[in-house]
Each structure stands twice: as C-alpha cells, then as structure tokens.
C-alpha cells in the first residue's frame, strides 16, 4: 500500500542509558508495568511469539505477534487493539521499535502505522505513546515515572 493510504505516528526520544538496559525496560514485564500505567507485557520475545498487553484485572488492551526481533536493536510487532471496538475494527497495525546508541544515550524511535488513511487508531496511539515513553525515559534516568495517571483512561 502506498504512503498516501497509510496512517503513521513516529516518536523519537533520547534516553541516557545503554541499548541492553533499554531493551530490558521494553521487554521485562515488571519494568513495563512501572511506566505503562500498571499494564504489563506477556511475550516469548522470539519471531512468531504471541504478544499481549495485560491490565491488572487480566483484561487485554492489545494483542499481536513478534514479526521481527533483533535484541537490543530492533523489534516489529503486529499490534491489534482489544479494548476499544472502534479501534479494534480497523484491524492490526504495525509497531517498530528501533534502538540506536548515540554518545551516552540511546535514540529510541517508535513507528506505529496502519494501512488505512485517517486511522482513529493512529490518532489514539499518538496521544498514548508520548506519556508512556516520557515515563520510560524518566524511570530509566531518575528512577521515577513522570506521569502516574494515563491520559484518557
């Protein structure tokens, strides 16, 4: 599908850490819970592994599959919203994590895209990713999250 028919959100941040530490923060369930508003991740972290985000009550926010994985540099997830019927109806999206060392930091680029124009899912994630990634950055650099209440939830 050409770019005109695709919706995309890209977020770039620099985090003072190492690629292995950032990778662990992105994939270790108890660490994820700290910055992702008490939601955690479950996955085997291999190509083809099922992937899911789980609330404390056991309900799913998102599910998917690992499409590509190259620790600690790159990961691509087929991502399906599960909690909002309107967003779920758009079908699966694709989320790419890229980690690049830069001096004493890591450049983290998140690209979340779907093959449909004017996606409500991409509008929603464009509001959610900044708060989660701000928390991730704060937690790795200071030991504390910046935001304790998920905006919009």
Question: Where are the predicted features?
Answer:
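Short acidic N-proximal helix/loop "leader" segments that mark the beginning
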Residues: 1-10
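Beta-strand/loop substructures that line and gate deep hydrophobic ligand-binding cavities in soluble
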Residues: 84-130, 147
């Amino acid at each position: 599908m050409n770019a005109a028919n695709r919706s995309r959100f890209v977020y770039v941040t620099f985090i003072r850490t190492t690629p292995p530490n950032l990778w662990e923060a992105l994939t270790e369930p108890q660490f994820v819970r700290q910055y992702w508003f008490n939601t955690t991740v479950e996955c085997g972290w291999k190509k083809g592994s099922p992937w899911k985000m789980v609330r404390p009550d056991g309900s799913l926010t998102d599910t998917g599959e690992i499409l590509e994985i190259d620790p600690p540099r790159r990961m691509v997830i087929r991502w399906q919203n599960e909690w909002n019927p309107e967003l779920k109806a758009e079908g699966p999206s694709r989320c790419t994590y890229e980690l690049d060392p830069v001096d004493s930091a890591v450049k983290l680029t998140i690209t979340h895209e779907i093959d449909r124009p004017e996606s409500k899912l991409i509008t929603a994630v464009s509001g959610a990713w900044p708060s989660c990634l701000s928390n991730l950055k704060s937690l790795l650099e200071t030991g504390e999250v910046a935001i304790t209440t998920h905006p919009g939830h």
